[in-house]
C-alpha cells in the first residue's frame, strides 16, 4: 500500500506540477498576449501622436506664413502712408498757388505794357517790378519754379504749342516766343508754357 500510496501521491504531485506548469504557461501566454496588445496600442498611440504633431507643425508653419505676410503688409501700408503724407506736404499748396498764377500773369502784363523809360510811368514800372520779384521769390521758397523756355527746344511735357511759324532766326522745333509762362511746383507741372514754335 505504501507503494500505491506513493504512486498516487506522485501522480497527484505530477498533476499539481503539470497544472501549475499549464497555469504558468497560460499566464505567460496571457502575459505575452497582454504585452503584445499593449505594444500594439502603444504603437497606435504613437502613430496618432505623430499625426497630431504633423498637423500641429503644419498649423505652426501656416501661422508663421500668416505672420510674415501680415508684417509685410504692415510695412507696405507704412511706406504708402509715408509717401502719401510726403506728397500731401509737397503738394498742399498746389490749389493755392494755382489761384496765384493769374496775379503773376497780370504783373507780367503790367510790366510789358508799361514804358520803363517814360518819366510818368517809371515809378509805377519799378514798383510793379519789385512787387513781382518779391512775390516770385516768396513762392519759389515753397517750390514754385517759372518755366520760361524762350530759345529752348520745344518740350511737350513742359510746353503747349499755340502754333508754328517759319523762322530764319530759330532752328526747327525751337520756342520762338513765350505767350504765357508755365510753372512747376516741386517738379510737377502746374501749367505748361504757352509758346510759338519755329518750323525752321
Swiss-Prot record:
GO terms for cellular component: cytosol. GO terms for biological process: protein folding. Residues 1-25 are annotated as: Disordered. The keyword Cytoplasm applies. Pfam families: GrpE. Its main location: cytoplasm. GO terms for molecular function: adenyl-nucleotide exchange factor activity; protein homodimerization activity; protein-folding chaperone binding; unfolded protein binding. Residues 1-11 have a biased composition (Polar residues). Keywords: Chaperone, Cytoplasm, Stress response. It is found in: Cytoplasm. Gene3D superfamilies: 3.90.20.20, Head domain of nucleotide exchange factor GrpE (2.30.22.10). CDD domains: GrpE (cd00446). Homodimer. Participates actively in the response to hyperosmotic and heat shock by preventing the aggregation of stress-denatured proteins, in association with DnaK and GrpE. It is the nucleotide exchange factor for DnaK and may function as a thermosensor. Unfolded proteins bind initially to DnaJ; upon interaction with the DnaJ-bound protein, DnaK hydrolyzes its bound ATP, resulting in the formation of a stable complex. GrpE releases ADP from DnaK; ATP binding to DnaK triggers the release of the substrate protein, thus completing the reaction cycle. PANTHER family: GRPE PROTEIN, GRPE PROTEIN HOMOLOG, MITOCHONDRIAL. Belongs to the GrpE family. This is Protein GrpE. It comes from Shewanella pealeana (strain ATCC 700345 / ANG-SQ1).
Amino acid at each position: 500500500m505504501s507503494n500505491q500510496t506513493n504512486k498516487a501521491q506522485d501522480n497527484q504531485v505530477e498533476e499539481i506540477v503539470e497544472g501549475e506548469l499549464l497555469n504558468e504557461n497560460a499566464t505567460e501566454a496571457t502575459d505575452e498576449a497582454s504585452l503584445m496588445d499593449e505594444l500594439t496600442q502603444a504603437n497606435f498611440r504613437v502613430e496618432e501622436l505623430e499625426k497630431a504633431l504633423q498637423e500641429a507643425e503644419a498649423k505652426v508653419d501656416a501661422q508663421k506664413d500668416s505672420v510674415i505676410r501680415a508684417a509685410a503688409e504692415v510695412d507696405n501700408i507704412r511706406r504708402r502712408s509715408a509717401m502719401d503724407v510726403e506728397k500731401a506736404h509737397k503738394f498742399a499748396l498746389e490749389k493755392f498757388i494755382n489761384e496765384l498764377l493769374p496775379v503773376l500773369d497780370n504783373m507780367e502784363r503790367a510790366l510789358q505794357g508799361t514804358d520803363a523809360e517814360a518819366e510818368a510811368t517809371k515809378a509805377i514800372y519799378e514798383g510793379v517790378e519789385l512787387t513781382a520779384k518779391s512775390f516770385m521769390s516768396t513762392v519759389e521758397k515753397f517750390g514754385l519754379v517759372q518755366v520760361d523756355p524762350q530759345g529752348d527746344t520745344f518740350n511737350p511735357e513742359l510746353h503747349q504749342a499755340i502754333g508754328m511759324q517759319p523762322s530764319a532766326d530759330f532752328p526747327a522745333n525751337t520756342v520762338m516766343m513765350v505767350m504765357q509762362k508755365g510753372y512747376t511746383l516741386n517738379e510737377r507741372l502746374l501749367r505748361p508754357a504757352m509758346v510759338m514754335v519755329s518750323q525752321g
